[in-house]
């Protein structure tokens, strides 16, 4: 499955537009991770714990979106957008949206 943020792919033509596909994930945080993140914020470092959680959530939503596109008969998803939101005090939501398409190489 080819995934792209752009609306077109060089060397390919879209032969079928199959619809909008999404992937969603809501991840909970925990006390220890929050504590470590706040310490990193105070001393100006990066929060590896949160970065790892963001990467995990991003992988989940992209895989979920790919599976939904595959069920529609797509071999690519174009125009992908990723959104990140905090939900309440201790939850992180990641949403991926794109267009499922069937592509073929240009001749």
From Swiss-Prot:
Q: Which Pfam families match?
A: YbjQ_1 (PF01906)
Domain of life of the native organism: Bacteria
Check the record and name the InterPro entries matching this protein. Answer: UPF0145_dom_sf, UPF0145_YbjQ-like
List the HAMAP family hit by this protein, alphabetically: UPF0145 (MF_00338)
Family to which this protein belongs: Belongs to the UPF0145 family.
Q: What is this protein called?
A: UPF0145 protein CHY_0465
């Amino acid at each position: 499955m080819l995934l792209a943020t752009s609306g077109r792919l060089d060397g390919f033509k879209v032969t079928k537009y199959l619809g909008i596909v999404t992937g969603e994930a809501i991840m909970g945080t925990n006390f220890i991770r929050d504590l470590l993140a706040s310490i990193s914020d105070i001393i100006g470092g990066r929060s590896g714990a949160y970065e790892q959680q963001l990467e995990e959530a991003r992988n989940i939503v992209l895989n979920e979106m790919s599976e939904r596109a595959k069920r529609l008969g797509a071999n690519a998803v174009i125009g992908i957008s990723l959104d990140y939101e905090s939900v309440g005090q201790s939850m992180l939501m990641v949403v991926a949206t794109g267009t499922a398409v069937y592509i073929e190489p240009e001749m």
